[in-house]
Amino acid sequence: MEKTLIFQSVDEIRLKKLLRFIIPTYLTSLFTTVYTIVDGIFVSAYVGTNALAAINVVYPLVNILYGIALAFATGGSALAALHIGGKKNDEASRTFSISMTAAIVIGALVSALILFRLPLILQMLGATSLLMEDCKAYIYWWLFGAPIVVGKEMFTYFIRVDGSPTYSFLTALSGGIFNIVFDYIFIGQLHMGITGAALATFLGLLLSFVMGVVYFVTHPNFLHFTFRGLSIKEAFHSMINGTSEFVNQLAIAITTVVFNRSALLFAGEDGVAAVSIIMYLQFLCIGIYFGFSMGLSTPLGYAYGDRNFSVCRVLEKYAYRFFAIAPIILYGSTYLLAPIGVRFFASPGSTVFDMAVSGLRLYGLGFLFSGINIFAAIRMMTYGKGYISGMITFLRSFALLLLFLIVLPRFLELNGIWLAVPAAEILTLIVALWTLRKKTIA
């Protein structure tokens, strides 16, 4: 039990103590990313780049499921943290219970609707006749397993807010290891192809989900399942507060389609494969920012719920120092190590390899600015101001990105696709800095 991670005063704040939240949260984000990246590596090595492109084509549907889960998970867990900080554990448990129920039900309904018109939807996403069967084989497991996919993500966030970030990390670690082992068995040994990749991912998610159920049944700290006093209004409040993450996932879904179609126009199916590789690798980089921000958000939420604004200000200073240094190190590493990262997915000297390396170095310029944008959005969500958080995320992940994806390739062709993200992040930074200049909201 890690209840001591609630800071009662500024004097209690120590970096070592704070890292007990931040490090497990980042590692959780990292191993969640493993579900996707390991599939990509095995599929690329054993099946081929066309199968890799198929995964990228259908991934917008996965983003929709994650968007539903994250809207309730981030929004609901932020509200639960405020309740816990304010010594209102019963209200926190109600928020947890209604968020979990609503997310799973909505996720299942949306998946059923997608399955009803799946071939048409896949065509709209850009699945060619060459990719169609692989697209279907991969996405079926995600859609039929929607309650598990959504529930696993919900548990990840609420276990952390319940004061057990290490257990939250262990659920992700266990699922990630399970995923890797079964990828090797299904794809490498049994030659099940892209179906094996999807099945391995589902089994990893299932293990994490079961561990979440066991946690809340056996030894929760603050939160517990309850069906007393639940309301649709509370579910709506949780969803609205987590709007930024739903917007982010929906934006990823839409912009991935635009990325793929633009790459297909300028570089054919090799271009789509290069986009896939860059998307996989950027998850690792963005995960650092997201993991740090979400790790800090829980003690921030506790302090804000307790109206301990001096603690909030000190915690925010840690974030500003981190985001002054980390982006420079991250982009430098991305530029230098791009060939090594891409080598996991494509053969050196191939068209896809060269395209992905040069593209990642341009795309990675966005890492210099995205960190503070992500923190600004999560900070506002933590303080219960989901609409401001949603505005920041809408700008960086959708409106500005879509604008630059349409405009820049007209002048810079393929390089314009890679530079769309840095351009969107730079303009969003103006809004993010404006929100950060405002004092902690009382």
Residues covered by each model-derived region:
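Short runs within selected transmembrane alpha-helices of multi-pass transporters and secretion channels
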Residues: A73, W142-R160, S168-G176, A197-V210, ...
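Helix-terminus/linker motif at the lipid-water interface of multi-pass membrane proteins
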Residues: V34-A53, L122-S129, I185-M192, A253-L284, ...
